[in-house]
Amino acid sequence: MKIGNYQLKNKLIVAPMAGVTDRPFRELCLRYGAGMAVSEMMSSNPQLWKTSKSKQRMVHEGESGIRSVQIAGSDPQLMADAAQFSVENGAQIIDINMGCPAKKVNKKLAGSALLKYPDIIEQILKAVVDAVDVPVTLKTRTGWDTENKNCIHIAKLAEDCGIQALALHGRTKACMYKGEAEYDSIKAVKQAVSIPVIANGDIDSPEKAKYVLEYTGADALMIGRPAQGRPWIFQEIHHYLENGTTMPELPIEEVKSIMLGHVQALHEFYGEYLGPRIARKHVGWYLKEHEQASEFRRTFNAIDAAMLQLEALEGYFDNVAS
């Protein structure tokens, strides 16, 4: 699949997730089979660009793979400015967020709250496309609620505005992440536009990935929450799509190596104070299916020092293997 002039190495894309798809996580997913990774959402409000954490996350020069940066907001000019800023800092693709259902985003009329206002959507899309000379993509949902699904209209509008690919989550804004994603809307959008369509929502296994691709006719898949604590899911899905067979479960030693490497990367990226705190949620995701890990997770979450976190993880896996 191509987005503009960029050829993805496969059909599997890491979904942008606030507080999750930072540089260490994106690099890890790319290493384990993802064809592209989209950065976590960046606000179009320049006042929020000044924190050290934001500045650190905004620099994309030197990253592996195709660098896609997601921006969010409701003011067309601020969105255009954010797109230009991102390109100046290494973005090769700009992704516009109109899919996030979070209240703190929606109350600012950003994310999926915009689905009620196609006129504003059109202004934003045109402003961003005109502001940069890189491909612009859009991530959105099927509609405001189940009675107001307007994804076909939004998809056609996006295509007319110059959007070069569309990622569609199979839920409405009102659904948040409840219930199950539906794929009929994605199938209908794929049939309605000629730009690439990327299916998103509940793609949590190789078999589900194959089903969604075949049912919707989508050009690619976007995977978010199922990759938390399992970044190798992209490798598993790619193998299944190519060969029709499932890979064996990763040996515990390889899981240990991946997790320790990820935690070390977080420590190095965020520093001695913030790194261990961010590592906690990732370790929780890695160990969520380990029945014996509940007590360890509580202990681990109380550890503030980077070196002590690594020692604790070594000890945990030594006990599991013994």
Curated annotation (Swiss-Prot):
EC number: 1.3.1.-
InterPro entries assigned: Aldolase_TIM, DUS-like_FMN-bd, DUS_fam, DusB, DusB-like, tRNA-dHydroUridine_Synthase_C, tRNA_hU_synthase_CS
Keyword GTP-binding: no
Record PROSITE patterns: UPF0034 (PS01136)
Cofactor: FMN
UniProt keyword list: Flavoprotein, FMN, NADP, Oxidoreductase, RNA-binding, tRNA processing, tRNA-binding
Binding site for FMN: P16, M17, A18, Q70, K139, N200, G201, D202, G224, R225
Coiled-coil annotated spans: none
Superkingdom of the source species: Bacteria
Transmembrane segments: none
Active site (catalytic residues): C100
Catalytic activity: a 5,6-dihydrouridine in tRNA + NAD(+) = a uridine in tRNA + NADH + H(+); a 5,6-dihydrouridine in tRNA + NADP(+) = a uridine in tRNA + NADPH + H(+)
GO MF term (any one): flavin adenine dinucleotide binding
Annotated family: Belongs to the Dus family. DusB subfamily.
Function per UniProt: Catalyzes the synthesis of 5,6-dihydrouridine (D), a modified base found in the D-loop of most tRNAs, via the reduction of the C5-C6 double bond in target uridines.
Protein's name in the database: tRNA-dihydrouridine synthase B
Lineage: Bacteria, Pseudomonadati, Pseudomonadota, Gammaproteobacteria, Vibrionales
